[in-house]
Curated annotation (Swiss-Prot):
It is found in: Cytoplasm. InterPro entries: RNA_pol_sigma-70_dom, RNA_pol_sigma70, RNA_pol_sigma70_r1_2, RNA_pol_sigma70_r2, RNA_pol_sigma70_r3, RNA_pol_sigma70_r4, RNA_pol_sigma_70_non-ess, RNA_pol_sigma_70_r1_1. SUPFAM superfamilies: Sigma2 domain of RNA polymerase sigma factors, Sigma3 and sigma4 domains of RNA polymerase sigma factors. Residues 1-43, 57-105, 160-199, 265-288 are annotated as: Disordered. This is RNA polymerase sigma factor RpoD. Belongs to the sigma-70 factor family. RpoD/SigA subfamily. It comes from Myxococcus xanthus. GO terms for molecular function: DNA binding; sigma factor activity.
Length: 708
């Protein structure tokens, strides 16, 4: 068998015991690296490990002055030789290497010492990775550990180091890319080729996006802000948009709009929903009055800002009228007016930034502008259809049609030119005027020429696209954060992909509301939104019967209290004990316990083979049990035999009176009418028949049914 290279020895000492382990060198690339070890090789490594461990333990005891026990007189150098022999290494070569290259002078050990002095500790993994492969003897390992002790360097687990020093393992972009490439390679090596698992595909795609630094987040946030400012600047150039903004104040005053629908800083709707769902949780204090007063103050502040905006808008309108009037202005005055308009729009922009106008309002205004543009496009499409139909240019045709209304000769010329009858020319003229009228109506509503309106709308769309592109980059770069948070909420009623989807919705909300100027990292801000979106989705969708959010919180609190009491008293707590611990009324605790019950499917498989279902074991109380059915059949048979011993008249009277074999029982009057006798006679016949039935010869057949 060929000689094998020595394996590294990694030492994980504790205060009580030193346990060196043979650390394997990384296998070279190729098929040999992928092959499994033979049983003989594994056995040799285990033998070497035991020998080195025993030698190291003896050395420690010797240094502490502890006399070796019986069977412990093993020399460390002999142990090193045995370990080297176990892995088929020449001990003389090892000794020569040690003499020529002392452990303390090795570059790897020096680097370890430098890193340990800087941090104050080293992890076992760092020591194992850095130690050379030829350090296998207990003396060498002990020398290394002694050097760490002399330099006050503690050897700890990686997990303990992270907890004690609050160190979170960081992964660089390059490492993540390498991991992603390795995962993809592993997936490609699978027997079935690339995996079709949607979670795996999503994670692979997610891993291809680079992480962002704080500077990258700020740069993207600035691009989002610039795009939104472009939209607002384009809106200010449209008078119809300015009028929509001014109308917000009136809608606030008349309560047609709420504060949270107008500005970004208002409380979220989710908070108010919780308040609506749990009215009994609200105390009798002044909180509602304070909220109402706060909203009134906010409305007053917004109205003041809108009044300032109105003043600037009116001044801007006056200057624009002056600029567009037929009155001739000097070039100097024109420049002054244009500069004043620009300054006023800058001030209007500042007011909008102070207001922090909600994106819903901006989107609503943009939608209104889009509706105007669509009306213009529709009218222009009608004109183009007429051009194609009559093979003419509308730019030349419109003046001619206008002249033809006043001059019949021009109309005849047009008829000949277009090969139309007078009626067809009249229809063409009417269609053209209708389309032109639609365009002019839009211009009147927008108070702008169509060209300016379209130019402003294009600027709005450009700003929106830039902002959306930047938002998309910020979202894609933080998808890992969503996955890491969603992992903590698995097995709560929603699938993992659903949790990721809900978390992504929360992430997009966080992107919309992120303010980089406050100095916080985006992940810090987004974590709350992601967690809130996931928990709300679990509360809304995880249960078959939806439970309000405030009740979910109460249920979770009750479950935590119940677990605490189980640990404290050693058994399941009673509702009374839970109510006392939670300081809640007993009725409410019982109600919460009842609500917390989960529905279970009747198709739930039962048994090891799962060949039966839960529904098979549930009693159907709407059906008669087989035992009762047999008893009833026997009772009917015995009753029929007993009645057969009476006279036919007596039998029929009893049957009609007690409803035996009849649809219902009958009164004495009804039976008397059937027999054409009086009620008294029927009563006498009934009494006589019952006396006969009470005779032991007949009653013994029915007595067992009465007793049972």
């Amino acid at each position: 068998m060929p000689t094998q290279k020595p394996s590294k020895a990694s030492v994980k000492p504790t205060k009580k015991k030193v346990d060196p382990v043979i650390r394997k060198k990384k296998a070279p690339d190729g098929a040999a690296a992928k092959g499994a070890k033979t049983g003989a090789e594994e056995k040799e490594e285990l033998v070497a490990r035991d020998v080195v461990a025993e030698a190291t333990e003896k050395l420690k005891k010797k240094k502490k002055g502890v006399a070796p026990a019986m069977g412990d007189d093993v020399d460390p150098e002999e142990a090193a030789e045995e370990a080297a022999a176990a892995v088929q290494v020449d001990p003389d070569a090892v000794e020569d290497d040690i003499e020529e290259d002392p452990v303390a002078e090795r570059k790897e050990v020096k680097d370890l010492l430098a890193a340990g002095r800087e941090k104050g500790f080293l992890t076992y993994d760092e020591v194992n990775d850095a130690l050379p492969a030829d350090i296998v003897s207990s003396d060498q390992i002990d020398d290394v550990m002694s050097m760490f002790g002399d330099n006050d360097i503690e050897i700890v687990d990686a997990q303990k180091a992270a907890q004690n020093n609050e160190i979170k393992p960081t992964v660089t972009v390059e490492e993540e890319k390498e991991d992603a490439d390795e995962d993809e390679k592993d997936e490609d090596d699978e027997p079935g080729g690339k995996s079709n698992d949607p979670v795996r595909l999503y994670l692979r795609k997610m891993g291809s996006v680079s992480l962002l630094t704080r500077e990258g987040e700020v740069e993207i946030a600035k691009r989002i802000e610039d795009g939104e400012k472009e939209v607002l600047r384009a809106l200010l150039a449209c008078k119809v948009a300015v009028e929509e903004i001014l109308d917000i104040g009136n809608k606030l005053k008349t309560a047609k709009l709420r504060v949270r629908d107008v500005i970004k800083d208002a409380p979220e709707e989710t908070q108010s929903e919780g308040a609506e769902e749990a009215p009994e949780e609200v105390g009798e204090g002044d909180a509602p009055a304070q909220l109402a007063q706060s909203e009134l103050n906010k409305i007053e502040q917004i109205c003041k800002q809108i009044e300032r905006f109105r003043k600037f808008a009116q001044d801007c309108d006056v200057l624009e009228e002056e600029l567009s009037s037929k009155k001739k202005l000097t070039e100097v005055r024109k420049k002054e007016v244009k500069q004043e308009i620009k300054d006023l729009r800058t001030k209007m922009m500042e007011v909008l930034e102070e207001m922090r106008l909600n994106k819903k309002q901006v989107d609503r205004i943009v939608i209104n502008l889009k509706a105007l543009i669509e009306r213009v496009d529709k009218a222009e499409d009608e004109l183009r259809d007429l051009e194609r139909r009559y093979d003419c240019s509308m730019k030349e045709l419109r003046p001619q049609l206008k002249e033809s209304r006043e001059n019949p000769n021009i109309g005849k010329k047009l008829q000949k030119q277009l090969n139309l009858t007078p009626e067809q020319l009249e229809v063409l003229d009417r269609d053209v005027r209708t389309a032109v009228r639609k365009i002019k109506k839009v211009e009147e509503e927008a108070n702008l020429p169509v060209e300016s309106l379209r130019r402003n709308y294009d600027a709005i769309r450009l700003g929106e696209r830039r902002a959306e592109r930047a938002k998309s980059e910020l979202v894609e770069a933080n998808l890992r954060l969503v996955v890491s948070i969603a992992k903590k909420y698995t097995n709560r009623g929603l699938q993992f992909l659903d949790l990721i989807q809900e978390g992504n919705i929360g992430l997009m909300k966080a992107v919309d509301k992120f303010e980089y100027k406050r100095g916080y990292k985006f992940s810090t801000y987004a974590t709350w939104w992601i967690r809130q979106a996931i928990t709300r989705a679990i509360a809304d969708q995880a249960r078959t019967i939806r439970i309000p959010v405030h009740m979910i919180e109460t249920i979770n609190k009750l479950i935590r209290t119940s677990r605490y009491l189980v640990q404290e008293i050693g058994r399941e707590p009673t509702p009374e004990e839970i109510a006392e611990k939670m300081e809640l009324p007993l009725d409410k605790v019982r109600k919460v316990l009842k609500i917390a019950k989960e529905p279970i499917s009747l198709e739930t498989p039962i048994g090891e083979e799962e060949d039966s279902h839960l529904g098979d074991f549930i009693e159907d109380k709407s059906l008669v049990s087989p035992a009762d059915a047999v008893i009833n059949m026997n009772l009917a048979e015995q009753t029929r035999k007993v009645l057969a011993t009476l006279t036919p008249r007596e039998e029929k009277v009893l049957r009609m009176r007690f409803g035996i074999g009849e649809k219902s029982d009958h009164t004495l009057e009804e039976v008397g009418q059937d027999f054409e006798v009086t009620r008294e006679r029927i009563r006498q016949i009934e009494a006589k028949a019952l006396r006969k039935l009470r005779h032991p010869s007949r009653s013994k057949r029915l007595r067992s049914f009465v007793e049972s």
